[in-house]
Amino acid sequence: MESTRVFVSGLPPTLTNDQLKKHFETRFHVTDAHVLPKRRIGFVGFKSSEAAQQAVSYFNKTYMRMSKISVDIAKPIDAEPAHRKDSRTAQPDDALGNNLKRKRDGDTIKDSKTQEYLSLLQQPSKTRTWANDDQLPDPDETDSHAQEQEQPFDVDDQEELTYAQRKKAKLGQDANESSHVPVVAGYQPTTDESDGQPSPEKHEEELEDPQKDQAPVSDSDWLRSKTSRLLGLLDEDEQETFASPAAATNPTPIINSNVEKPEAESPEKPAESDLTKAPTAAEVDTNIENIRISARLFVRNLSYETKESELEPVFSPFGKIEEIHVAFDTRFTTSKGFAYVQYADPDAAVEAYRNLDGKIFQGRLLHILPASQKKTYKLDEHELSKLPLKKQKQIKRKQEAASSTFSWNSLYMNADAVMSSVAERIGVSKADLLDPTSSDAAVKQAHAETHVIQETKAYFKANGVNLDAFKQRERGNLAILVKNFSYGTKTEDLRKLFEPFGQITRLLMPPSGTIAIVAFARPDEAQKAFKSLAYRKLGDSILFLEKAPKDLFEADVPPQNPLPETKAVSQGFSTADTFAADEGDEEVMATATLFIKNLNFSTTNQSLIEAFRPLDGFVSARIKTKPDPKNPGQTLSMGFGFADFKTKAQAQAALAVMNGYTLDRHTLVVRASHKGMDAAEERRKEDTAKKIAARRTKIIIKNLPFQATKKDVRSLFGAYGQLRSVRVPKKFDRSARGFGFADFVSAREAENAMDALKNTHLLGRRLVLEFANEEAIDAEEEIQRIEKKVGEQLDRVKLQKLTGAGRKKFTVGAQDDES
C-alpha cells in the first residue's frame, strides 16, 4: 500500500493544524493535517498516493512565513529507522580523544620522577629545594587507573544506547563508585527496633537528596542531566508523569561496601517508548478474542468523505465481507469518520486487524478495534405462531427481504401492466387484445412483453444505464429496482413514496410505466428504504424491490424526458442485415499487405523502407532474398518484396500511390498480396467458413412450460427469422419434457432472437436460451471427441465390473449338500 501521507519539517513555530491544512489545500485536497509545534514538524494526508507525490514535488523547499519547509513521503510507523552517524556523533569522539591526550600530558607532568627531572633542568635560582620534602602522593594517581577500568560506557556511546541501557549503565556506575568509598569506622545503618529494617526516616532523607554523597560528575554528564530527552514531544503534564517513575526508581546511595548492591533492571523487561506505551500482550489477546467472537471490526479515524466502495478493496483481500457500514451524520450529510466491517470468517477479521491497524489510508492512520455483534431483531416464534399462516408468510418475507435472492430476472414486469400498456398504445381494450377463444394468447402476451422490454432497454441506455451490468450477480448498495406496480403509476407517486428515506439522485421510469430505478445518495438511505417498502401494497398491487446491479450507471448522464413517441428497437430484419455480418468478417480478414515486384537487384531493404515510410499507416517493408551460392553467408535479392500497413484502407491508398513509382531506375508494380494455397486447402477453407457460419443457428430453450406446444414455440421464435426446424421433446406419455430446440436459417437471425427473447416470460416462466453444442468443424476434433466418449464408456464398464463382482449370489454349504 503506497503512502498517502507526507512529512513536513521546518514549519513556523506558531503554525496551527488549520493553517497547515489551508496552505496545502490551495492546490490539493487534504484529508488530515497535524502539527507538532515544539518540534516544528507536521504531517499532511491526501486522498491518493498520486496526490501525495505531486504535493512533495510542488511544496518541497518552498517557504511558509519566511520559513523554508521540507516535504517528503511519510514512512510507516513500523518502518525501521536508518542507522547513520552524523557529525554530532563524530564530534564527541574527537573531543574525547583530545581530552584523553590532555589527561596523558597532565599525568606525565604529575609523575614524580618527571617532576624531579624537570626540576634539575631548571635554573638553581628557580628551584625550591624544600619542596621535595613536602611532596605527598597524589590520590588521583592511585585511582586514575581504577576509574578507567570501571567506566563501562563512553560518553559518545551513550547517545546511541537506548533509554533502558543508559539507565542500567548509570546504576552500575553508581554501584561501582559506592564500592570504593572507604568504610567509616563505627558506622552502623540506622534500623528500626521492631523489625530490624532500616529506619524509614533515614531512608526518606536519603531519597530527598540523592546527589549529596555522590562524587562530582563531569561537564557532559551534568549537561545531560539538565537536558530533556523528550525534545518537546510531550506536554508539561505528560513530562512530569513520564519523569515521576524514573525518580522513584533511583537507587539509594550505599555507604558500606558490605551491603548488598541493588539489582539492575532485568534485560527481559521491555523498554517503554518515549512517545506511546505499547499495548501489553493481554490487551492484544483480548482484542483478538473479541474479534473472533463477533467477526466485526470498528474502524475509526477515517476521512469524512470515505465511502464503502473505497473501503472494500482494502479489507476484501483478507476474506469474504458480508457488510461494510459507514456511519453518516444526517444533519450534515457527511461521514462521522468511522465504519463497521463485518466478515464471514472470524479468522479473516483477525488477519485484517493485525495487518491494517495503524496503516495509512487516505492520509490518515487507521485505528481498528473489536466491534460488538450487530443487533438483530428476530421474530418471536411463539407470538408469530398465533397469527394466520398467510400473515406469517407475509411477515417473514418482509423481514428477509434485504437478504433474500429473487427468483425472477432483473427486468421482470407485471404481466397485467404490460398488456395494459400495449393495449393503450395500439388503442384497443385489453379484452380485445387477449381473445379468450384464441389458443395463442400466451404467445401474444410474450410478444407484448418482449416489445416493452426492448423499449425499456432503449430508454435506460439513453439515460446512461449500463445494460451489461444486469448480467452480473454482484449487487450495489445505492440503486433499487422497483417492479410489479400497477399500470398508471406516475413518477411523482414513486418520488413521494421514496423521498422520506433520503435524497434521491435519480428516478428513471420508461414510457411503458412497468419498471423504475430509484438511486439514493447514500447506502444507508437506500437500505432503509428497501427494508421499509419491500412488499408494500401500492394501489392494487404489491411492490417488488430488488437491489440494482453494481456499476449500474455508466456516467453522469442527466435523465431525459420520456417522449410518447419513443419506439422500441425494430425487430424486422432484411436480407441485407442478415448477411451483413458475413461481409464484415470478410472485411476484417482482408489483407493489409502489398506485393511489390520489378525491384532492382541492387535495391536494399533500407531504400525500400525509405520509399514507403512517408505513407500513412506504414508498418514495415522487406525484400525477399535467397542465399548466394558463390559467396557463402551472403544473400541475393529475388526482385520482389512486401510492405505491411495497419489497415486495408491505408494499404489500398498506398497501392494507388506507389504503383508505377520509379525506384533505382526500375518501375515498381504493386499489387495486393494474397497467400497462395493449393486446391485442397482452398476447399478445406471454404468448408470451414460454411461450418463457422452455421454453427450458431440452433438455440436450446430451457425452462419451457409443460403446457407449451410446438406451435407456440414456432409462433414465438418465427417472428425473428426463418426457422429451419422446431423440436419439443416429449415423454412416453406425450407430455413435454420442459425444453425445446429452434434451428434458424442464419446465425444472425438466431442471435437476434436470442437477444430479444432472453428476458421474456411464456406462461409465467422465464425462458432460458442458450446456443446448442456446436458441431465439430474439423474432422480431427470430431475423432477426438468420439475417442473421449468411448474412453469414458469403457471406464464406466470397468468400474461396474469392479464394484459388481462382490455382489454375486452364492450358496453356503452347497457342495456339502451335493455330497
From Swiss-Prot:
Question: Tell me, what is an example of a GO biological process annotation in this record?
Answer: small-subunit processome assembly
Determine the domain of life of the protein's source: Eukaryota
Quote the Gene3D superfamilies the UniProt record gives: 3.30.70.330
Provide this UniProt record's keywords sorted from A to Z.
Answer: Nucleus, Repeat, Ribonucleoprotein, RNA-binding, rRNA processing
Molecular-function annotations in GO: mRNA binding; rRNA primary transcript binding
* Coiled-coil segments: none
Region of interest (Disordered), residue spans = 80-223, 242-281
Q: Where is the composition biased (Polar residues)?
A: 115-132, 247-259
In what ranges is there compositional bias, type Acidic residues? 151-160
Q: Please give the GO cellular component terms listed in this UniProt entry.
A: 90S preribosome; cytoplasm; nucleolus; nucleus; ribonucleoprotein complex; small-subunit processome
Record field: compositional bias (Basic and acidic residues): 104-114, 200-212, 260-275
Compartments it resides in: Nucleus
Presence of the UniProt keyword Nucleus in the record: yes
Query: Which CDD domains does the entry mention?
Result: RRM1_MRD1 (cd12565), RRM3_MRD1 (cd12568), RRM4_MRD1 (cd12319), RRM5_MRD1 (cd12570)
Coarsely, its chief localization is nucleus
Domain named RRM: residues = 4-76, 295-373, 478-550, 592-675, 697-774
Record keyword RNA-binding present:
yes
Query: What is the annotated role of this protein in its UniProt record?
Result: Involved in pre-rRNA processing.
Family of the protein in this entry: Belongs to the RRM MRD1 family.
Name recorded for this polypeptide: Multiple RNA-binding domain-containing protein 1
